[in-house]
Amino acid sequence: MYWNHVLTVLEILLFAVSILQFMPYVDIVHTVLLILWILIACAYVVTAFVLAWMSTFHKDSLKKNTEHKASHRLEPIEDCIPVLSAVLGLITSVRHLRHSSSLPETTDIAIVYNFLDKHHFVVILIGILGWFVLQIGFALIYERVDRESGCKELSFPETEHPTRVEYFYHSITIGTTFAVSDVDANTSHIRWLIMLHSILAFIYNTVAVAAVVDMISSGV
């Protein structure tokens, strides 16, 4: 239960930093926000995967916690937070690629940042972490929707009581292949959600590939 609250707090922080990056600031503030976004996203991804791993040992507590969350009217809005954060992160990485600026190398942090920025490691990190945040966000949506229906929306082979691992597997499979693999989608509702996920994943992957091509063509 405690770790789920931590994940929620990280979602909110990540979304807040994502929004703040679009405000007009001096370069140093933008740099701090970029670093914050990367650190929070790392913490979010690691925490989410740890929770998924823990769910295989605490199935009952996971089910109880998910059902409790599903009763909250704001849950659908909360579901959108990591997805929006991932999209805003991708937009930020593209903007940073186009309008990157170096910091005065007066501190060790500035020197390290300029080195990473020069080789576009910052953009690459944001892109990769944003992709994981997007897939995790949809995995949590699949989990909530499926458990609200009594696990009737999705059918996992030889798995009577799916854990969070199953939903992560389903989401990441769609994010990489745009297909549901061996998971059955049983209702129109979940098929609409899968279709939306596939479209967003396709757009995200296309923009990410375009950014990589742009970096290569620029001589990076």
What do the predicted segments below correspond to?
Residues E166, H170, A185-V220:
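Pore domain of cation channels
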Residues S85-D108, I174-H189:
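Alpha-helical transmembrane segments and their membrane-interface junctions
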Residues V45-S61, I136-E148:
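Membrane-water interface of transmembrane alpha-helices
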Residues D146-S188:
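Membrane-proximal soluble regions of multi-pass membrane proteins
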Residues F22-T47, K118-L134:
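Alpha-helical transmembrane segments
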Residues A48-L74, V94-D108:
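Membrane-helix interface/capping segments
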Residues Y2-Y25, V87:
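The first (N-terminal) embedded transmembrane alpha-helix
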Residues H96-S101, L129-C151:
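Transmembrane alpha-helix/helix-exit interface in multi-pass inner-membrane proteins
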